[in-house]
Regions:
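Positively charged n-region of N-terminal signal peptides that target proteins for export
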Residues: 1-4
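Sec-dependent N-terminal signal peptides
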Residues: 6-10
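C-terminal motif of bacterial Sec signal peptides marking the signal peptidase cleavage site
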Residues: 13-16
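Bacterial signal peptide processing site
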Residues: 18-21
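Post-signal-peptide N-terminal segment of Sec-exported extracytoplasmic proteins
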Residues: 26, 31-71, 133-142
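Short structured motifs
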Residues: 32-38, 81-85, 111-114
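Intrinsically disordered, low-complexity Pro/Gly/Ser/Thr-rich segments with frequent PxxP/GP/PP motifs
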Residues: 74-109
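Terminal connector regions
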Residues: 105-155
Length: 155
């Protein structure tokens, strides 16, 4: 009976260590807002595709992102919430995580709406939020991130 308890404890610790290792790998990843593209438009809303590049700098270990919740702004005005789930980044690679957004026209003022519809070079997109990775025993651990800018403010 004691052997089974010890074996169960050892198995639990090994699983927890693996989860902590993948979480550490995620903390060492680089994040960049790669693209924000207008994909659809109609009288009531605009559709966008947001691409976030996640670079795993570790040469041997994968990194795992449980989920990400963030806010996308354009020219310092709130645009939409961005959510990503269950992303695995293989060692020494870049993963382009994609999120599709539908934003009501009422979210934009007329000037900003015109700039977006023309894909103006004066647009400045910014993404911030919280990424969550799975820690020991399935506990989600939050880490605030500033993924960065794409557009006019990104020199």
């Amino acid at each position: 009976m004691k052997k089974w308890g010890f074996l169960l404890l050892l198995t639990g610790l090994l699983c927890a260590c693996a989860g902590v290792q993948e979480a550490q790998n995620l903390a060492n990843c680089k994040f960049a807002l790669r693209n924000v593209e207008l994909t659809d438009y109609n009288l009531s809303s605009l559709g966008f595709e947001v691409v976030i590049a996640i670079t795993n700098l570790n040469r041997k270990q994968p990194a795992s992102l449980k989920h990400f919740e963030g806010k996308l702004t354009v020219n310092d005005e709130y645009m939409a919430d961005v959510t990503l789930k269950d992303i695995r980044i293989e060692p020494n690679t870049v993963k382009n995580a994609r999120a599709k957004l539908t934003v009501p026209m009422s979210a934009f003022n007329n000037k900003l709406l015109g700039l977006i519809s023309m894909n103006s070079a004066t647009l400045d997109y910014h993404l911030t939020g919280t990424m969550y990775f799975e820690g020991p025993l399935g506990v989600e651990i939050p880490v605030p991130v500033n993924i960065g800018r794409y557009g006019n403010g990104n020199f």
